[in-house]
Amino acid sequence: MRTHYCGHLNKSLAGQTVELCGWVNRRRDLGGLIFIDMRDREGIVQVVVDPDMADAYEVANTLRNEFCIKLTGEVRVRPESQVNKDMATGEVEILAKGLEIINRSDVLPLDFNQKNSEEQRLKYRYLDLRRPEMSDRIKLRAKASSFVRRFLDDNGFLDIETPVLTKATPEGARDYLVPSRVHKGSFYALPQSPQLFKQLLMMSGFDRYYQIVKCFRDEDLRADRQPEFTQIDIETSFMTADQVREVTEKMVREMWQELLNVDLGEFPVMPFSEAIRRFGSDKPDLRNPLELVDVADLVKDVEFKVFSGPANDEKGRVAVIRVPGGAELTRKQIDGYAEFVGIYGAKGLAWMKVNDRAAGVEGIQSPVAKFLSEDVINGILDRTQAESGDIILFGADKANIVAEALGALRLKLGKDLGLTKEGTWAPLWVVDFPMFEEDDEGNLHAMHHPFTSPLGVTAEELKANPAVANSNAYDMVLNGYEVGGGSVRIHNAEMQAAVFDILGIDAEEQQLKFGFLLDALKFGTPPHAGLAFGLDRLVMLLCGTENIRDVIAFPKTTAAACLLTDAPSIANPAALEELAIAVTAAKAKDAE
């Protein structure tokens, strides 16, 4: 039906007759001529309909926005004075010879000339995707996927599919369960990742595997999370952690170079402990110059218990952020930041304005200065390298609360005060994560997943002191987002059983949930390591947006609902009966 895309037309086609298919983006009448901005997925071109072309002119008179049309016309170069430099096709226009309405359109429920609500955009997503901005994002996603496949194919990786209906295993979030009709009372789980299957593929001898795969997690949603998401899944045998990082870093660097013409440079490597200490986060945004500075040793002996309490607690922390120029913050703004850190468990936000550094204590304005000696204040000023006009913000509590609260405050201050260097890129690797993390009850949980190998310890050493062990894991971070995470995997049954024991998974449960894996580990398992990228998050960054819904064709809401199809929906009672399932929640709701 078409010979060209609208957005591909240029001066080299002058004089040629082309056939185009697309939509009316805009129609206007000027001096007897009708001008149509015609749009398809590749762009917009201006069409001129002259009254001399009577049939085409008659049709053009009836056109309205979003009519689907077919056009036959001649490409001609615009006069220099009429060139539109804001359009990719602005040097040419099409003189209409034939015009056909393929389909008419009702008035759209979306207004492309103004901001529509998120709800309206998701309900009429097929219309929202017609907008050039959205179309460009989906096309960039396609290019990113294509690049990944080419890169991994060229580097010897095999694209192998893994099951979607599988067994529930503990991977950190709730599973989406699928009832079995044949095995009544039993359920499949949709995979949170292909983790175990890709490890089994390594045991099968496929030493370089990849897959661009859908994964599912039933968890509370955020702007950068969806219940179903796409993962670039990678696994290798006989490669070290350094080698895995090298090849995956190369992939991301070349992707940015090809798609954005941006050189990310070599990625720095930072231990987890340093990231938490300096930035309060294991995914620090290095575009932001603010850092956390520990001052617990300076305030251990002060009478102010808010500081000295955490300073003398082995699980406590006292840290500060020096904000250049922050002395200009009003009390109302500071109170707003105090309320903000409260979201993360902080009980308040002490502050110290440095009005005149040369004046020492006399140049300080702070509600807590009266509780601190001159030596302590000067020590804090010296350590933070404070200057006149700065403000110092304090966090004092359990170490994890201080890290989370000040880490989040650091990001907010960076944006609010224009300190974060927008439009730049700051990648890094974070390595040497703790093997386990402790919950409020003192129980240990795997920081990544229970198949991650510890770093440099035997099974006996790990069992003797699990709380201090590090894992051979690594995360790729870009502009404060974790875009990929991976690890060296456990490849012998003894170590795997030891990790399960530490996590409180007894021998019976190990066999019930992971018997197939423990058996497989007995048959000459090679050392293996891998990494998985979130494709949605990578594309979100490539597109310069802050919400992954912007780069998914048909996303869910933050309530995990599809406004377009009204999913999830109530199941047919006959289907539920066949599955031997009774929906007690619905019955209870009906009874109310």
UniProtKB/Swiss-Prot annotation:
Q: Which UniProt keywords apply?
A: Aminoacyl-tRNA synthetase, ATP-binding, Cytoplasm, Ligase, Nucleotide-binding, Protein biosynthesis
GO biological process entries? aspartyl-tRNA aminoacylation
* Class of the enzyme per the UniProt entry, highest EC level: ligase
- Binding of L-aspartate occurs at E171, R217, H448, R489
Q: Out of the domains of life, which is the source? A: Bacteria
Q: Quote the CDD domains the UniProt record gives.
A: AspRS_core, EcAspRS_like_N
Q: Which SUPFAM superfamilies match?
A: Class II aaRS and biotin synthetases, GAD domain-like, Nucleic acid-binding proteins
Under catalytic activity, the entry for this protein gives:
tRNA(Asp) + L-aspartate + ATP = L-aspartyl-tRNA(Asp) + AMP + diphosphate
The record ties this protein, via NCBIfam families, to: aspS_bact, PRK00476.1
Q: How does it assemble?
A: Homodimer.
Q: Which family does it belong to?
A: Belongs to the class-II aminoacyl-tRNA synthetase family. Type 1 subfamily.
Record's function text: Catalyzes the attachment of L-aspartate to tRNA(Asp) in a two-step reaction: L-aspartate is first activated by ATP to form Asp-AMP and then transferred to the acceptor end of tRNA(Asp).
Per its record, how is this protein called by name? Answer: Aspartate--tRNA ligase
